[in-house]
From Swiss-Prot:
A motif ('KMSKS' region) lies at residues 228-232. L-tyrosine binds at residues 38, 165, 169. This is Tyrosine--tRNA ligase. Homodimer. Catalyzes the attachment of tyrosine to tRNA(Tyr) in a two-step reaction: tyrosine is first activated by ATP to form Tyr-AMP and then transferred to the acceptor end of tRNA(Tyr). Its EC number is 6.1.1.1. GO terms for biological process: tyrosyl-tRNA aminoacylation. Pfam families: SYY_C-terminal, tRNA-synt_1b. ATP binds at residue 231. GO terms for molecular function: ATP binding; RNA binding; tyrosine-tRNA ligase activity. A motif ('HIGH' region) lies at residues 43-52. Belongs to the class-I aminoacyl-tRNA synthetase family. TyrS type 1 subfamily.
Amino acid sequence: MSYIEKQEFLAELKTRNILKDISSPEKFFNLKPDQGIYIGFDPTATSLHLGNYISISLLKRLQKIGIKVLAVIGGATGMIGDPSFSSKERKLLDFKTLNANKEKIKKQLESFGLPVFDNFEIYKNMNILDFLRDVGKNINISYLLAKESVASRIEVGLSFTEFSYQLIQGWDFKFLAENYRIIGQAGGSDQWGNMVTGLDFIKKSNLDQKDEAFVFTTNLLTDENGQKFGKSLGKPIWLDPEMYSPFHLYQFLLNQSDEQAEKIMLWLSFLDLKVINELIFKHKKDKKQRILQYNLAKQVVFDIHGDKGLEIAKKITKILFEKLDYTKITFNDKLELKKIIPYFKVSFFNANQIIDLGIFKSKRELNEFISHKALEINGSKISNISDITEELKDKSNLFLLRKGKKYFFMIELI
């Protein structure tokens, strides 16, 4: 890739509002074909989330233009926990949990076509004395304490374990530069301090490429309130389809505001900027059609879950919100629905049973919905409470209940 092409690539990252800071654009422009860039992912859960996907998509963008990339899974750093801009100490994971997380996230990253390296390989044979002599000797404690990411935690308390995190992440960079010619590191904007520590380790080394290393950060994926998409706020949008279905991701993206949809489209989609601008123009001409949101949902769900995941998401959306003819709902569709809407198994089915299940608070409420023609079972409008019988079951012994416009329930007769 030529110098000019790299300039154009960086300019596009700025236009998409992906790029936050870069230590040296010139060093990125002069990146050699055998040199590469990495991003780290700590295995603190069984799945990565949408906040991580901006980093995954960045590696894919770099890969697409011919730059060597590496996804580094934090088998070592995950044991410690990154304190950067965190308000409290992170809970340490036991080895069994960490290793299970590691395996799942490794498969997840590989599913996006990314090569993966586990940083535990760097430290598994290093003892504490080696670490203090080789790593600790090369860094000044006052330099570390001055970092904003550390200073923000000093007053509330910072353990030596978490304090050491930036040393390990920094040493990762030096090791990868020395052994794999990985001289660039990217990450979220909250990682700047840790990444610059790695630059310092490299500058103090005897590497022939020590003056070529650089780091750059991306803006964090945030909601309308400026809160980052992640798991720490308690509402993670997992990339694992078993933990957060393609349908739920599709709906999440469909329900974004115009401003937020435009922002996420630029961040996460691989559509050309010209195409995105055309979609924005069409959307503004008739906002009720939600052209931007539909295209955003389509692009991101396809990129994360593939064609099958997108088709499932679109089909379930039709079933639940566009009143698809019940006869066109397949058995596989029903299996997917069971994962998405409240699902119950019962040995008998009648009006009292659906009240006992909590679908209706009382017989009075049930009758109110029936009188307003607001209860459907397997596509049939219920006009009388006595119509709620097992005769309504389908061939799979299933009942799909629609309560009003928004609430759905699946009941299986066993």
